[in-house]
Regions:
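Extracytosolic helix-loop segments that constitute the early lumenal/periplasmic catalytic or substrate-binding loops
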Residues: 6-12, 26-50, 57, 64
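Hydrophobic/aromatic-rich transmembrane helices and adjacent perimembrane loops
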Residues: 306-332
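Short periplasmic/luminal acceptor-recognition loop of GT-C membrane glycosyltransferases, typified by
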Residues: 352-469
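Membrane-interface transmembrane helices that cradle and orient dolichyl/undecaprenyl
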Residues: 97-99, 137-153, 328
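Transmembrane-helix signature of polytopic, membrane-embedded enzymes
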Residues: 91-114
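Transmembrane-helix motifs of polytopic, lipid-linked glycan transferases
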Residues: 78-99, 138
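Transmembrane-lumen/periplasm boundary regions of multi-pass, lipid-linked membrane glycan transferases
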Residues: 26-32, 158, 162, 166, ...
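Specific aromatic-rich, kink-prone transmembrane helix
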Residues: 90, 131-148, 320-323
């Protein structure tokens, strides 16, 4: 099962072009932080970035990927893929130790074929979400294990702090789940344990905040609170609108067959007058409370937030997979032959269907011709660190896609510029990106320019002759 997950996550991982939202932004932040040797302040085009208002842990993860496999799309996404694998592994281990091998296998199968978890802004992209989902999962599984040993509660608190340092206020879901879990399970902690838990949750965040404050005071925190929390929660920003049915529709779009199987299993249990857990076992009762909260809390909080984005509910896929695995294993081991046969056929059909979707996706990367043209500068001699301008006949300032900014930086440390054609002519260390519909021979001859390279998207021009590397 792990081999299926590994294939789904890593096959052709570096062959897909970089996406502008949001992996390119994170990739630029990480690249520039690494180049400048500043691991605290994220920048975009070498200016402090007050649009991407996240603490630095996800940038550090991308930096690690760059260091391990190079400045390329694979380096951008490597740690996301590893975190997705780790999420599947810790889910499998938790379920195996508490519910048996079959439940573990089925949970792995479900999560390994969850299309949104794999291909939408998570496992196969350089976004912060895969790391966040891993830390979210680690936090809640540790919370569930704390019924056996209080030390796991502190692990949960520490995982929360790392989740906050990855995706900021999104980690609030973990804190809400922790609070409700302790309330509903009747857990009572001593003052000493409360203090220890709070230290585990807050100390890493406070250390980062103090260090960040040294650079720009409260400027980052003000934007982080006002825009990334209050504004995002109360107003649909950047066109991300939706009503109360939004995330239900998202789940049906990406997870319909697994949801149908889950609903069918719940109905079977109701008709058979069975229970999912032994009510006499308080440990099992704690597990079902935690798993239900893990699904319900993020779903409700994101439903009531005004800004709706489909990948916000990624953290609920691990608990859904766990619940499906546990229920399915109980039915397959205890129910009548007909019910077991129907369930097994349904599981195999769903897994086969979603695996087919994943196979289609990973085997058909959609090329981006503009990025491919920029990548061709890798073969040019002596242009590393050049400025890159974009030509427009009406002298408008260039608008750069974030994916183009990152590709330029990764390929040749090119610095994209917003200046017009005349700014390019004044710069001795510069290249000009020209879209094919704007290109004319007169543009080249009248300005004594050279065609450096080209493809079906357009041309790259220079004022000097540039050799191809041998």
């Amino acid at each position: 099962m792990l081999s299926i997950a590994f294939y789904n996550i890593f096959y052709h991982l570096g062959k897909f072009p970089i996406y502008s939202w949001d992996e390119a932004r994170h990739g630029v932040n990480a690249y520039e932080m690494l180049r400048q040797g500043n691991f605290i302040v994220n920048t975009y085009r070498y200016k402090a970035d007050y649009w991407n208002l996240k603490p630095p842990l996800s940038y550090w993860a991308i930096m690690a990927g760059y260091k391990l496999v190079g400045f390329n799309a694979l380096g951008l996404r490597l740690i996301s893929g590893i975190c997705a694998m780790l999420t599947i592994i810790i889910v499998a281990i938790f379920v195996k130790k508490n519910f048996g091998n079959l439940a573990s296998l089925l949970s792995m199968l479900t999560l390994s074929t969850s299309t949104q978890f794999l291909i939408n802004h998570s496992a196969r992209t350089g976004d912060a979400d895969s790391l966040f989902v891993f830390l979210f999962t680690a936090a809640i599984l540790s919370l569930l294990l704390s019924v056996k040993n209080d030390k796991w509660l502190y692990v949960s608190g520490f995982a929360f702090s790392l989740a906050f340092l990855t995706k900021s206020w999104h980690a609030g879901n973990i804190a809400v789940i922790m609070g409700l879990y302790l309330l509903f399970t009747g857990r009572k902690l001593s003052y000493k344990k409360w203090i220890s838990l709070c230290l585990c949750m807050m100390a890493p965040i406070l250390i980062w905040a103090v260090i960040r404050y040294q650079y720009d005071g409260f400027a980052f925190f003000k934007n982080m609170f006002e825009y990334d929390l209050l504004h995002r929660s109360t107003v649909p920003i950047e066109g991300h609108v939706g009503d109360e049915s939004y995330y239900g529709i998202v789940l049906c779009r990406f997870y319909f067959l697994w949801l149908a199987i889950l609903l069918g299993m719940i109905l079977v249990y109701n008709f058979q007058n069975n229970v999912l857990f032994d009510k006499s076992n308080s440990e099992n009762q704690s597990y079902i409370i935690g798993l239900c909260l893990w699904v319900i809390v993020p779903f409700i909080l994101y439903t009531f937030a005004k800004t709706k984005i489909i990948w916000y509910i990624l953290p609920i896929y691990p608990p859904l997979s766990i619940i499906i695995g546990i229920l399915a294993s109980k039915i397959l081991m205890k129910e009548r032959f007909l019910i077991r046969t129907v369930l097994l056929a349904s599981i195999l059909f769903a897994a086969h269907y979603y695996e087919g979707e994943i196979q289609t996706y990973v085997n058909n990367p959609i090329p981006n011709d503009q990025l491919s043209l920029i990548e061709k500068t890798k073969a040019l001699d002596g242009v590393r660190g050049y400025s890159l301008y974009k030509y427009h006949p009406t002298r408008h300032k260039a608008v750069w896609a974030q994916s183009a900014v990152l590709t330029a930086e990764l390929v040749n440390d090119l610095k994209v510029k917003s200046g017009d054609f005349h700014a390019f002519l004044k710069n001795d260390r510069a290249l000009l990106l020209v879209k094919k519909r704007f290109f004319t021979k007169r543009l080249v001859t009248s300005n004594l320019l050279n065609i450096v390279t080209s493809n079906r998207w357009g041309y790259i021009l220079s004022k000097e002759k540039i050799r191809i590397k041998h």
